[in-house]
């Protein structure tokens, strides 16, 4: 029996924070200058729409659609391909594939930039499936995505979820999937007290060394 590996994307396989924050700050400076400080410290992980709501706050709700549109233009066309994979990401994905494990993505990142970046990195052969929240309008969160799209869990010897935020841990816990915390990502300062973690890793090389 093979194993199933579910990976988050931003903050787990790729370090997208510099580019994404650069875009958030640039657009916030244009639309809502008083919120720049908030944008500079925003957690990378929630969907674009959720983040736009957080940055703009209730006082600027009428700007949300414009914010999202400007972000997509700036990020997808100018910034996306500057994103770097984490060290050992390619090696870890290749290692799991060579062991005949199934590897999938479950991410809040939009589908278009996710697939464009995966193609640019040459990672398409590694993934059996790529799940991006904006492509599944009927699901309210990543936990719903996993629950409804991953069928026949009993066919796998083991299932693991690797992610870097509390939302990832919650998703794994709600679906009774062992969670591996990638502490090199963006969720280090979050409150992890209610999340069950089977292993914490400081590098993706630990996937190769321990699994």
Where are these regions (language model features)?
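Conserved H-loop
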Residues: 34, 124-128, 156, 198
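A short, structured active-site edge motif that brings together acidic residues
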Residues: 40, 124-139
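Short, acidic loop-to-helix structural element flanking the phosphoryl-transfer center
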Residues: 77-105, 112-115, 140-143
